[in-house]
């Protein structure tokens, strides 16, 4: 009986220790996946951005939100998750498939999905019962509006090659910012279960 209690205590300590939290540690793998996704987006370039200058648009990336220090840990996690989810949704469409090299697009979608799955292990413990409440908060709404603007732009431009190129460049900016946000979360302790 003493052995079982010792084992249970060890498991509890490991789950709340610096390397534990039952899988909610923002790993280096998550950062590597993020960098690989940026590399894939760069490789997806089919047109010179200079040839699409007439189609440029400021989508209003909420930079201060993803790069500033104004968000608390749970909010930052929600913003990161929403940015990755919306990026995945943007590239995981029929219209997107018609615009890009299929192999690179599949690799990008797989990479984004992997990041989301890695974050999903933390979503429940970090969000708990606050999930529905946080889903309505201003930063999440801002991210959703940002991506709605991108979808509207593509539709307005009839999903032209230049429109997709402008969006590709914009998504490189957005995912680069989300990588900065991931790094900030990691520096906050990395352990998303910690109070």
Curated annotation (Swiss-Prot):
Disulphide bond pairs: 24-122, 52-162
Glycan-linked positions: 101
PROSITE patterns: INTERFERON_A_B_D
Pfam entry (one): Interferon
Gene Ontology terms describing biological process: defense response to virus; female pregnancy
Record keywords, A-Z: Antiviral defense, Cytokine, Disulfide bond, Glycoprotein, Hormone, Pregnancy, Secreted, Signal
Main location: secreted
Tissue expression from the record: Constitutively and exclusively expressed in the mononuclear cells of the extraembryonic trophectoderm.
GO molecular function annotations of the record: cytokine activity; cytokine receptor binding; hormone activity
A Gene Ontology cellular-component term: extracellular space
Signal peptide from the UniProt entry: 1-23
Gene3D superfamilies: 1.20.1250.10
SMART domains (UniProt xref): IFabd
Annotated compartments: Secreted
The family this protein is said to belong to: Belongs to the alpha/beta interferon family. IFN-alphaII subfamily.
Miscellaneous information on this protein: IFN-tau genes are intronless. They evolved from IFN-omega genes in the ruminantia suborder and have continued to duplicate independently in different lineages of the ruminantia. They code for proteins very similar in sequence but with different biological potency and pattern of expression.
Biological function: Paracrine hormone primarily responsible for maternal recognition of pregnancy. Interacts with endometrial receptors, probably type I interferon receptors, and blocks estrogen receptor expression, preventing the estrogen-induced increase in oxytocin receptor expression in the endometrium. This results in the suppression of the pulsatile endometrial release of the luteolytic hormone prostaglandin F2-alpha, hindering the regression of the corpus luteum (luteolysis) and therefore a return to ovarian cyclicity.
Name this protein carries in UniProt: Interferon tau-11
Protein's organism: Ovis aries
